[in-house]
Amino acid sequence: MTSSSPSPQASMLLYWHENQYDDRNFQIHGRTLFFALALFSVVLFFALLTLYIHRNCLPRDSINLHASSPDRLTRCRSGGLDPAEIRSLPVVLCRRERAEEEEEKECCICLGGFEEGEKMKVLPPCSHCYHCECVDRWLKTESSCPLCRVSIRVDSSS
């Protein structure tokens, strides 16, 4: 005699406890919620820190993005140049030539024009010119060119 009904073990395997996985029983307890929020906060903090570093410490132009220059990370250092370094920058007198008179030159810090015979400082890495007083004040707090942001720091190892 063969029975067509499943054995008791087989029926136990197929038996489903619906109320065991019901959504109404799903609860987030205090400790789990605390750890989930702490993990989310840590991930958010590191994401914002990475974004800040990429925006403020890495070069903005794609040309220098992969270049291995010692000036790449000097922009991250806070503070300006030493007074001796500021005094060592070259000073030139402004001379108007006829070709330059059509194109008005001005100091991008104070937006004032350069007058004939006025003293200007030239920043060596980029050759940008500024009024001596303007760029001296700038370089006391910053170590980069005000216009192109290239580092002005002199490498002490050379």
UniProtKB/Swiss-Prot annotation:
Record's bilayer topology term: Single-pass membrane protein
UniProt GO MF annotations: transferase activity; zinc ion binding
Keyword Transferase: yes
GO annotation, cellular component aspect: membrane
Assigned keywords, A-Z: Membrane, Metal-binding, Transferase, Transmembrane, Transmembrane helix, Ubl conjugation pathway, Zinc, Zinc-finger
Locations listed in the record: Membrane
UniProt-listed Enzyme Commission number(s): 2.3.2.27
Pathway: Protein modification; protein ubiquitination
Signal sequence region: none
Superkingdom of the source species: Eukaryota
Gene3D superfamilies tied to this protein: Zinc/RING finger domain, C3HC4 (zinc finger)
RING-type zinc finger span: 107-149
Annotated transmembrane regions: 33-53
Keyword Transferase: yes
Gene Ontology BP annotations: protein ubiquitination
Primary location recorded for the protein, binned into one broad class: membrane
InterPro entries: ATL1/ATL16-like (IPR044600), Znf_RING (IPR001841), Znf_RING/FYVE/PHD (IPR013083)
Pfam families hit by this protein: zf-RING_2
SMART domains: RING
Family, similarity comment: Belongs to the RING-type zinc finger family. ATL subfamily.
Entry-linked PANTHER family: RING-H2 FINGER PROTEIN ATL16 (PTHR46913:SF1)
Swiss-Prot/TrEMBL domain comment: The RING-type zinc finger domain mediates binding to an E2 ubiquitin-conjugating enzyme.
Protein name per the record: RING-H2 finger protein ATL66
Species name: Arabidopsis thaliana (Mouse-ear cress)
Organism placement in taxonomy: Eukaryota, Viridiplantae, Streptophyta, Embryophyta, Tracheophyta
